[in-house]
Amino acid sequence: MIRYLKKAIPISILASGMMVSASFADTFTLRVGSGHPSKPTAYVGNMEKVLVPNIKKRVAAETNHKVRIIEAYAGKIAKVHETLEAVEKGLLDIGSYCVCFETAKLLPWNFDYFVPFTTTNLVTNWEVKHKILKQFPELTKMLEDKYNQKFLAMQGFDDYGIGTVKQWQKANELKGVKVIAAGPNLPWVSLFGSIPVTSTLPTMYNDLATGVAKGVIIFPSAHAGGFKFYEQAPYWKVIGFGAMAQTITTINLDTMKKLPPEIVKIIMEE
């Protein structure tokens, strides 16, 4: 929810008539956030360390306005499966989320989970998906028409693999084993004859620690990084499921209408 305060700044005072010419400097408050935590999640970390400071810096340098940004990561305002709706309703002005948790509303955005070919290179995946977004503008338009938000940027995850509690050599050894996945990659679990268990990044560690599942399909930067899945599922194998450009950043359309054009331009460019 955007808030702003106007402050009159005298530009010139004419002694003859004591006339005051004034311009108005507005201070805008923006709520920015994600359901995932910042430190262990690359796309949220970029939001905190790149997007937010760049917006503040450029607005201060290039306009007469100021922005105050309230940052709400790790589900402080919206959980991973609630961020789309939070931006839609204006609870967040700008939000980042994985479309993989929105298969009911954004299934067309998840096409790269279902195509019979892929790439393990995230940059290649990102470039191809951007070309598709340009070729089929219906994908970004559905965000505006149905969910009151505009597409700003797309990020992604590196090549998915599988981490397990016990060591294994052949895929048939995973038959009947409970394996965690999320959203549209749940069908991958069945390829091993395993039992799919639905979870999300913030809850996967505890699910492994408490025995809810004995394996997890995840991208390596999460397995070996700040989420520390390697502590509970130390045996990691590269499967080649592919990298996925699945996380997007959007801005509430009502917020855009209330912001000055020069600030909107900066946000769109960042």
Language model regions located:
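A structural signal for alpha-helix termini and helix-coil/disorder junctions
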Residues: I11, A61, Q135-E138, D145
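Bacterial N-terminal signal peptides that target proteins for export
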Residues: M1-I11
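Bacterial N-terminal signal peptides
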Residues: P10-M19
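Signature of the catalytic double-stranded beta-helix
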Residues: W126-T140
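N-terminal secretory/targeting leader peptides
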Residues: D26-W126, M142-E270
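Generic N-terminal leader/processing signal
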Residues: Y4-L5, S16, T29
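Sec/Tat signal peptide C-region and signal peptidase I cleavage site
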Residues: M19-A25
